[in-house]
Amino acid sequence: MTSHPSFTAARLRRWLLALACCSFAALAQAQALPAKFDATRDAAADVRTAVGLAKAQGKQVLVDVGGEWCIWCHILDKFIATHAPVKRLVDENFVVVKVNFSPQNRNEAVLSQWPKIKGYPHLFVLDAEGRLVHSQDTGELEAGKDYDEAKVIAFLEKHRRAK
């Protein structure tokens, strides 16, 4: 009888260790995605990582294409960070990956698989399998010198993963 409880304890320890390893792996992958546009990043690898995270987390992928040179890219980043309803929708429904477009790195191999971009930033929504769901010209989401919260929320709600 004493072997049965220790067997259960051993199984529990293995299960907890496996859970901890998975948690650390997911955290490491999430931290591996760029927080800003970086010409030195491997965009294809970043998109693959984002798709893997989206699949594991039941989310869509929001591919944000732009560059550090792009004023509207920074305006969009600030807009998302400072508008709680928008930030909540993004955080709860999307894995965000930034793909650089600049003279140093146009990331043509990655970007050529999706529709042409007219301006920056540009957003692509991918499903958890990496398939294109939507291509969004962010100019359509603007209002004056900022973004329109209602338009951004409508875009995010329309393209989040059905639950």
Residue ranges and their predicted role:
Residues 15-26:
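Bacterial N-terminal signal peptides
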Residues 118-162:
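Non-catalytic, surface beta->alpha helical segment in thiol-disulfide oxidoreductase systems
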